[in-house]
Each structure stands twice: as structure tokens, then as C-alpha cells.
Amino acid sequence: DELNRYSDLETRRTQDLRETRRGIRAAQQRVTNSEKEENRLTDVIARLERARREALARGAATARATITTASLGTLPWPVDGNLLYRFGPAPGPDNTEITWHGVGIGSAVGAPVRAVASGTVVDVGERGTYLTTVILQHGGGYYTIYATLSDATVHLGDPVVAGEVIGHVGGASTDQGSHLHFEIRGPDQIALDPLNWLQKKQP
């Protein structure tokens, strides 16, 4: 009857509201987790940079920096794909906001990810919401970060050359779908906008 119909409708509305609230809380938690991973990455880079500077102070021989300010606008893209999100603050899922310290490049799962410059693998492993992550050191305080990989094909301490495959695209289960999260960190661990450093893509 009419009363039961209204009761069922109200029950469905209540369930929908609960599911919406659960979805929003889950989205907020994912954003919080991503921000925590960014902070952990910054801590890792700071530790690596301290070790590099201590080695310099001891007179250790160092290779020439392979990324410098002369590299602006010249670095190759680490993977073929489309730009999903840009450096800086951006809308997140379910009306959240997230500040990206790099860019997201959408590409198929398993697509090869290549080093944008020669360097040394200084960190490789699982990093929470960023999944498998590889960090390369390029000298002069510059680092590149390749995250949301399905796997890494390099190991800690490996030297790599520009264009060498270091892993493959993963991230199919993320809000953005399969993609590479790519960052460039400069002196003093400052996150730099990769689009200023990568070659301009033809429209």
C-alpha cells in the first residue's frame, strides 16, 4: 500500500545516504594516505641528500650531474600517455582536494617506464598508495620519482642510462586508473613541476 511504498522509499534514501557518506569518507582517507606518502617520500629524499652531501664532504668522487637547470624543457617523457593530473592543488574524488607534487600520466598497464636521465637507483620498493616506486639520483641534488608501477626492473645501487626501462605502469586500482605518477625533486628536496622540465608535447 501507499504507506509501505513511502517506507521503502525512505529506507532506500537512508541506505543511499549512508553509502554516499561511506564513499566520501573512503575518498578522504585515500587523499590523506596519498599526502602521507608524499611526506614519506620527502623524508626519504632528505635522507638520501644528507648522505650524498656527507659523501661530498668526505671527498668522495661524484659523477657529473645529469639534470641541471639547463635541462628545463628538454627531458624525454618517462612513458607514452596522456596527462591525467598536473602539479599543484587539484580536485580529488568526491569533492576532496589533493595537492600533487608531480604529474600523472595515463597509460596502459604494463607500458614501459623509462629513466628521463642517467642516474643511480637509490630507492626501490613498495610505498603504500604509490605502489612500487623507483627513485633515481642524478647528482646536484636532483632526483626523479617513478610511482604506481606494476613492477621495477632495476635494483638498489644500479646505474641507469637515459631511456632505460626501469619498470612498468601499474595503478589500475587507483582512482585515476592505470598511470605513472612522476616527480622531480630539486635541491633542498623541493618538488618541481615536471611539465617545466619535460619536452613540450605537440598539440
Provide a role label for each language-model segment.
Residues D1-A70:
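Alpha-helical oligomerization segments with coiled-coil/rod-like character
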Residues L72-P203:
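Catalytic cores of peptidoglycan-degrading enzymes
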